[in-house]
Design a protein with these regions (language model features):
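N-terminal accessory targeting/assembly segments
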Residues: 1-124, 135
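Charged helix-capping and loop-helix junction motifs
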Residues: 125-131
């Protein structure tokens, strides 16, 4: 049986994602449908932590009332079919010399900056860059 729903990206590693349906926070695995990855984007990865996504999952008939974490497994992950519009995001330039960017997090409500007083020394330009990024992207 095919089920569809919305979930929030809680973690991503390479092409593997962990999604969560709020408010339960049941984490379940997902992969990205190929055509989404190919859309014209200058980001290194089209999906970021915090994105709200639409997914489809093929589950057995006898487990349809179980939590998502029990219905969807790593052997049979959900498929992310689309990404909902973002409210905001935090971005940085990619580490290579290309013109790509890396979206660190999406739909961020608050940003907390925790730094050390003495060691390791915090560089003030890094602090400035983070604060300006949060202001520019409405975090």
């Amino acid at each position: 049986m095919l089920i569809k729903g919305e979930a929030t990206v809680a973690q991503h590693t390479g092409s593997h994602y962990l999604l969560s349906t709020l408010p339960q926070w049941d984490l379940f695995p997902a992969v990205l449908r190929g055509k989404i990855r190919l859309k014209g984007s200058n980001a290194t990865n089209p999906v970021a932590v915090g994105d709200v996504v639409v997914f489809e999952a093929e589950v057995a008939e006898n487990v349809q009332d179980a939590p998502m974490a029990e219905m969807v497994t790593a052997e049979n992950p959900a498929v992310i079919t689309s990404i909902k519009p973002r409210n905001n995001y935090i971005i940085r330039k990619s580490t290579n010399l290309s013109r790509q960017s890396h979206i660190i997090a999406a739909n961020v409500d608050r940003a907390f900056l925790v730094i050390t007083i003495d060691y390791p020394q915090v560089k003030l330009p890094f602090l400035d860059r983070l604060l300006v990024t949060c202001e520019v992207y409405n975090v």
